[in-house]
């Protein structure tokens, strides 16, 4: 199984957007080569996301991380007034992290938009970049945030949700990710709705899917794509997943998410969030 950690700038892709006139760095994504390569050109496959009503996903965050002269972007969610949930691969090796909240269009000035520095961040101690296991991390912000209509907390699973069967349920993934495999980005928050599939079906594609992960169907061509890494997967207003990996054939293979309910104890140890 071939795994590639990709920063889109390596392909010469320019993300023509900015946050308050500051150029947005490329996104950081994990691509896993499917066992059987789809018979489509990923550059032609547009992911059928829809623009959300502005600020209707108020826990959605946009992060920019840096290490030396290299910067990259990811998504995430606000889980307490001071902690952000994201994927481990989004903050691994970062020397600085900046989190933007209350945003809808990254390229426009919005009075609701707030950018806060990360004070510290931690990834799961058993994160495996080879098999993409335990792809979860948290960021402590430098200050507590004031909640507003545009900045709210994500609702995470309860202890009763541990081990529940999610197969067949409709889930929503959201973010500022690319609208196709490589070339087109968006400055507005998009969402895509689809159905959770079994890990067995997902493993027919990737062979590395674990019980601590959950997969989203690609029926109708709706899927998470490059740039959505770290963002939320929500079922009935509860965040059950974190965008982890997929293939560059966004519209032709499932997306894989870290299953949040598998890490409730870890989150309680490494953040202020408490399970109900």
UniProtKB/Swiss-Prot annotation:
<dbReference type="GO" id="GO:0007586">
    <property type="term" value="P:digestion"/>
</dbReference>
<dbReference type="Pfam" id="PF00089">
    <property type="entry name" value="Trypsin"/>
</dbReference>
<dbReference type="InterPro" id="IPR033116">
    <property type="entry name" value="TRYPSIN_SER"/>
</dbReference>
<dbReference type="InterPro" id="IPR001254">
    <property type="entry name" value="Trypsin_dom"/>
</dbReference>
<keyword id="KW-0645">Protease</keyword>
<feature type="disulfide bond">
    <location>
        <begin position="225"/>
        <end position="250"/>
    </location>
</feature>
<dbReference type="InterPro" id="IPR009003">
    <property type="entry name" value="Peptidase_S1_PA"/>
</dbReference>
<keyword id="KW-1015">Disulfide bond</keyword>
<feature type="disulfide bond">
    <location>
        <begin position="202"/>
        <end position="215"/>
    </location>
</feature>
<dbReference type="InterPro" id="IPR043504">
    <property type="entry name" value="Peptidase_S1_PA_chymotrypsin"/>
</dbReference>
<protein>
    <recommendedName>
        <fullName>Chymotrypsin</fullName>
        <ecNumber>3.4.21.1</ecNumber>
    </recommendedName>
</protein>
<feature type="disulfide bond">
    <location>
        <begin position="74"/>
        <end position="90"/>
    </location>
</feature>
<dbReference type="GO" id="GO:0004252">
    <property type="term" value="F:serine-type endopeptidase activity"/>
</dbReference>
<keyword id="KW-0732">Signal</keyword>
<dbReference type="GO" id="GO:0030574">
    <property type="term" value="P:collagen catabolic process"/>
</dbReference>
<feature type="propeptide" description="Activation peptide">
    <location>
        <begin position="17"/>
        <end position="45"/>
    </location>
</feature>
<keyword id="KW-0325">Glycoprotein</keyword>
<dbReference type="InterPro" id="IPR018114">
    <property type="entry name" value="TRYPSIN_HIS"/>
</dbReference>
<keyword id="KW-0177">Collagen degradation</keyword>
<dbReference type="GO" id="GO:0005576">
    <property type="term" value="C:extracellular region"/>
</dbReference>
<feature type="signal peptide">
    <location>
        <begin position="1"/>
        <end position="16"/>
    </location>
</feature>
<dbReference type="InterPro" id="IPR001314">
    <property type="entry name" value="Peptidase_S1A"/>
</dbReference>
<keyword id="KW-0865">Zymogen</keyword>
<feature type="active site" description="Charge relay system">
    <location>
        <position position="135"/>
    </location>
</feature>
<feature type="active site" description="Charge relay system">
    <location>
        <position position="89"/>
    </location>
</feature>
<comment type="function">
    <text>Serine protease with chymotryptic and collagenolytic activities.</text>
</comment>
<feature type="active site" description="Charge relay system">
    <location>
        <position position="229"/>
    </location>
</feature>
<feature type="glycosylation site" description="N-linked (GlcNAc...) asparagine">
    <location>
        <position position="144"/>
    </location>
</feature>
<dbReference type="GO" id="GO:0006508">
    <property type="term" value="P:proteolysis"/>
</dbReference>
<comment type="similarity">
    <text>Belongs to the peptidase S1 family.</text>
</comment>
<feature type="domain" description="Peptidase S1">
    <location>
        <begin position="46"/>
        <end position="272"/>
    </location>
</feature>
<feature type="glycosylation site" description="N-linked (GlcNAc...) asparagine">
    <location>
        <position position="193"/>
    </location>
</feature>
<keyword id="KW-0720">Serine protease</keyword>
<keyword id="KW-0222">Digestion</keyword>
<keyword id="KW-0964">Secreted</keyword>
<keyword id="KW-0378">Hydrolase</keyword>
